[in-house]
């Protein structure tokens, strides 16, 4: 077989043979086999060219995908599959990219954690789940997470949350809100307990009274038309306790309000 034409088509080249067979190849393929118009090739060499072209094209696709941002091994595999790369050669492409350090899940985890420490608000449990979803092995994630102390980040977030809610919630509800928010963000109980203690939150009696009367008035307006005096009182007590107010404080406020 003779090569009758090699023509550039965007990122690939078209290779035409005198047996009317055409195939797409990469520039690396041309260089590797020193292909040129008029060259005679046999069936075995043609097969080698096809295999190399697929590998080269797959690698170039992977590099293109990685060029936008760091990717995990699983993400690159999925991208290659979506672009119809032969599943039999994907492992070879991945091994090649890993050997040249284009894919490195350990580095990905380190960067992910560091970015979260700098600008994020997630604790180790949420981080682990996010990384597992990206196909990274649990042992790699855990190894990197164990090297990080998340208390400073938890402390910074707790201070922001405290400023947000300190004038909106009674003491118990405020502490519960901080506990729930930090736990939901993936911080472990011991760290959450420590950073909340370190805030040294104290009860502001004047603020608590102001908040409880506002809430009491709100509940009264909502419930007074539906219930008699006794039922109304019980429902208001239950509603305020659910919002974190202490029973004795509620009773005291009710005595003055009703």
Swiss-Prot record:
Alphabetically ordered keywords of this record: Cytoplasm
Lineage start: Bacteria, Bacillati, Bacillota, Bacilli, Lactobacillales
This protein's name: Regulatory protein RecX
Secretion signal, residue range per the UniProt entry: none
Biological processes annotated in GO: regulation of DNA repair
Function comment: Modulates RecA activity.
Subcellular location: Cytoplasm
Domain of life: Bacteria
Gene Ontology annotations for the cellular component aspect, listed alphabetically: cytoplasm
Major localization listed first in the record, in broad terms: cytoplasm
UniProt similarity note: Belongs to the RecX family.
């Amino acid at each position: 077989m003779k090569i009758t034409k090699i023509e550039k088509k965007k990122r690939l080249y078209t290779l035409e043979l005198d047996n009317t067979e055409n195939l797409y190849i990469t520039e690396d393929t041309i260089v590797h086999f020193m292909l040129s118009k008029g060259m005679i090739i046999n069936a075995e060499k043609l097969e080698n060219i096809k295999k190399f072209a697929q590998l080269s094209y797959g690698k170039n696709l992977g590099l293109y995908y990685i060029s936008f941002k760091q990717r995990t091994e699983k993400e690159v595999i999925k991208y290659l599959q979506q672009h119809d790369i032969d599943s039999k050669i994907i492992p070879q492409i991945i091994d090649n990219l890993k050997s040249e350090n284009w894919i490195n899940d350990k580095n990905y985890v380190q960067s992910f954690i560091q970015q979260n420490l700098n600008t994020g608000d997630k604790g180790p449990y949420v981080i682990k789940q996010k990384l597992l979803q990206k196909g990274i092995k649990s042992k790699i994630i855990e190894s990197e997470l164990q090297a990080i102390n998340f208390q400073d980040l938890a402390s910074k977030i707790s201070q922001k949350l405290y400023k947000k809610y300190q004038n909106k919630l009674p003491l118990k509800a405020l502490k519960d809100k901080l506990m729930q928010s930090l736990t939901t963000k993936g911080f472990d109980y011991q760290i959450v307990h420590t950073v909340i203690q370190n805030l040294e939150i104290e009860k502001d009696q004047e603020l608590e009274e102001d908040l409880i009367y506002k809430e009491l008035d709100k509940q009264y307006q909502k419930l007074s038309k539906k219930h008699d005096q006794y039922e109304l009182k019980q429902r208001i007590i239950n509603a305020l306790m659910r919002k974190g107010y202490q029973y004795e404080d509620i009773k005291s406020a009710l005595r003055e309000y009703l």
